[in-house]
């Protein structure tokens, strides 16, 4: 009887740990989610650029999903014109550095090519209180006079 109870408790603990791990994975967007959001952002910009940028800045229209959001910059001067990271709105994307001090903004700027989705990798902490740096990947493309991107946190299994 005691053995059966212990087996049930162990099974319950395994399920709880598994559920917690699954919940954490679901709280972050995947590479496929990020690429799909970028593709939707491209369609929105082509349809109505000013409305799209407004939606991106406000996180409306499905353009804020967990830790995923589009950000866009002017090709002419590199200025960020849409982002959920309000501290970089209006700054030059080319000056961005990751938390290790590595400049990655110029890579993002240079990667913005019409009809191509490129990737740039850098180190950034996930949203929340944990300051641990993890690999973040941004998918980037060009839409008219804008460079647009969506970044996701790579799995750290």
For each of these PLM feature ranges, what is it?
Residues 2, 6-157:
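N-terminal membrane-sensor/transducer module of prokaryotic signaling receptors
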């Amino acid at each position: 009887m005691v053995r059966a109870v212990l087996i049930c408790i162990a099974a319950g603990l395994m399920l709880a740990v598994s559920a917690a791990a699954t919940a954490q994975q679901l709280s972050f967007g995947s590479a496929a989610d990020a690429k799909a959001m970028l593709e939707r952002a491209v369609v929105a910009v082509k349809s109505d650029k000013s409305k799209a940028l407004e939606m991106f800045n406000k996180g409306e229209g499905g353009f804020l999903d967990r830790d995923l959001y589009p950000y866009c910059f002017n090709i002419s001067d590199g200025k960020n014109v849409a982002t959920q990271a309000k501290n970089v709105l209006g700054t030059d994307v080319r000056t961005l550095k990751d938390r290790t001090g590595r400049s990655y903004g110029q890579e993002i700027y240079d990667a913005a090519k019409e009809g191509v989705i490129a990737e740039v990798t850098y180190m950034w902490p996930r949203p929340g209180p944990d300051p641990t740096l993890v690999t973040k990947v941004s998918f980037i493309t060009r839409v008219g006079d804008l460079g647009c991107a969506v970044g996701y946190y790579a799995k750290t299994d």
